[in-house]
């Protein structure tokens, strides 16, 4: 909580900096009580974030709703927007399609469905890379939707060509 307070002080003082909030709520060591407390802290940041980038599980935890299909993704994106986020992209991965990685972007007015072919290899860290790439594009003054599209393509290409750089196949996270 102390770190969250320091971070909040920073974002309140620097409203001219684009903020990409990647709400990592789930890891092997997390417990329900910790997730609930972290959720409450993260919600406080929504009004200051240029965009939030939860995956499906994180979006479900933040909205406290289940996502079973694309329409649910849209409804949860709208709900997260209504909680104060300026823009929302929910990373759907391949939960609903084995062929396509489907993300939903919402800006308060329009939904945009972003798709790319599913690549199963070397995808550890893809979510963090996606959020970092969005931040980089925003610092280059890209509009938010364009930044998201560029980031999705960047991550796709990075995974697609990762074997050329010696990235180990099927990296074991344990």
Ranges and model annotations:
Residues 145-174:
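Charged C-terminal helix
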Residues 2-7, 38-42, 72-76, 126, ...:
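General structural feature for long, well-ordered alpha-helical segments within catalytic domains
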Residues 61, 121-144:
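Short, small-residue alpha-helix embedded
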Residues 1-44:
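Glycine/small-residue-rich loop that forms an oxyanion/phosphate-binding "nest" at active or ligand-binding sites
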Residues 25-27, 93-96, 118-120, 152-155:
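Glycine-rich beta-alpha junction loops
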């Amino acid at each position: 909580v102390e770190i969250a307070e320091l971070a909040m002080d920073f974002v309140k003082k620097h409203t001219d900096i684009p903020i990409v909030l990647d709400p990592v709520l789930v890891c092997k060591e997390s417990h329900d009580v910790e997730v609930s407390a972290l959720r409450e802290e993260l919600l406080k940041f929504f009004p200051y974030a240029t965009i939030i980038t939860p995956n499906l599980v994180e979006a479900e935890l933040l909205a406290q709703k289940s996502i079973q299909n694309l329409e649910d993704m849209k409804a949860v994106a709208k709900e997260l927007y209504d909680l104060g986020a300026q823009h929302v992209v929910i990373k759907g991965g391949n939960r609903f399609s084995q062929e396509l990685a489907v993300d939903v972007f919402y800006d308060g007015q329009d939904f945009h469905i972003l798709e790319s072919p599913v690549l199963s290899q070397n995808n550890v860290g893809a979510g963090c890379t996606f959020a970092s790439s969005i931040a980089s594009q925003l610092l280059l003054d890209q509009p938010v939707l364009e930044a998201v599209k560029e980031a999705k393509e960047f991550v796709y290409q990075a995974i697609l060509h990762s074997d050329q750089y010696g990235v180990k196949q099927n990296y074991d996270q344990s």
